């Protein structure tokens, strides 16, 4: 059994849900609740994409976050498939900034997904 990793109270996970990352992708947005650094970005598929990988561009107030886009691969696609990215350079955000997740490239009808940003209070 794996041991759970503990997170300090200064680390918060904020999530948004997209109704489709497949043939008709829908971008989703998160409001940043406090001054922070962006530690990790993840996507969890709630269905199986087909044909091609899903590329997920992530931006802070419209500017790409370093290391973006990341990929949810079609290989092994299925419900609960997780893809994640750690920014290649520190990215800092202020309260009320916006983080956007823009999926593209995958196919399959109405494949929902949940996007999460792991934020560490400054």
Question: Predicted segments — roles?
Answer:
Residues 23-30, 44-46:
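Short, charged beta-strand/loop "edge" motif centered at a coil->beta-strand transition
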């Amino acid at each position: 059994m794996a041991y759970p990793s503990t997170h300090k109270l200064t680390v918060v996970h904020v999530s948004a849900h997209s109704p489709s990352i497949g043939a008709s992708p829908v971008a989703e947005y998160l409001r940043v609740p406090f001054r922070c650094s962006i530690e990790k970005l993840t996507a969890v598929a709630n269905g199986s994409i087909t044909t091609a990988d899903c590329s997920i561009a992530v931006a802070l107030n419209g500017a790409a976050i370093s290391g973006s886009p990341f990929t949810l691969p079609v290989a092994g696609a299925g419900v609960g498939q997780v893809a994640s990215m750690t920014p290649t350079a520190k990215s800092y955000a202020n309260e009320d900034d916006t983080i956007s997740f823009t999926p593209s490239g995958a196919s399959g009808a109405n494949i929902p997904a949940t996007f999460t940003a792991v934020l560490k209070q400054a």
